[in-house]
Amino acid sequence: WDGRAKTLADQAAGPPLNPIEMASSSFDEIIAKLNADRKFAKAFTTVYPDGLTQANITDAIEHFERTLITPDSRFDKWLRGDDSAITSEELEGYELFKKYDCATCHAGKNLGGLSYELMGLRRHYFADRGLELTVEDNGRFKETQQERDRHRFKVPGLRNIEHTWPYYHDGTRETLDAAVRDMALYQSGVELTDEEVHKIEAFLLTLTGEYKGQLLTNSNSRDMIDGH
């Protein structure tokens, strides 16, 4: 969200040491645990002759993460000319998505991830949220110390968005319906009707892709990746 990791390998080094994720105290601790599995350590050296190091571990994770692509969503198929890939209601949702300027920030191959934008462009999100501000709420400012970057966050990509809840950097929205309503209000200054929310949400569901030829669902996504 704040752009602190400059490369995918840098990102891979974060969760192992995060106290609320994997909670290791250091990479020395991680390396010692991995070396205790002699079979794994031996297999690792067939790819990385100098063995288990922080650089090699994060490089390996980076290479795995690069395989986690999910092409061939219904929207992809529609863009390639298959008019039957999405319904008229979903297409209306796409038109609303563009009408209310969602596509201005959620652009590119992943419908996001290209820029840092203010959270609460048209209305003060943090005041309305009613929670005490945290360091994480500073967003990009944490890294740049530039006042213009306070509350500015990387725009998330929208592929597979139905499976990536809870939403926002603070995880305060658990449904896509609520996230769509809020983003229209806080970023575009628009109060959507229930029908408009439903149609935009229908469009967003067309962005769910396939992994190894299987459509991602809440029930199968972990199994498919674990079996990679």
Question: How does the language model describe each region?
Answer:
Residues 1-228:
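Periplasmic c-type cytochrome electron-transfer domains
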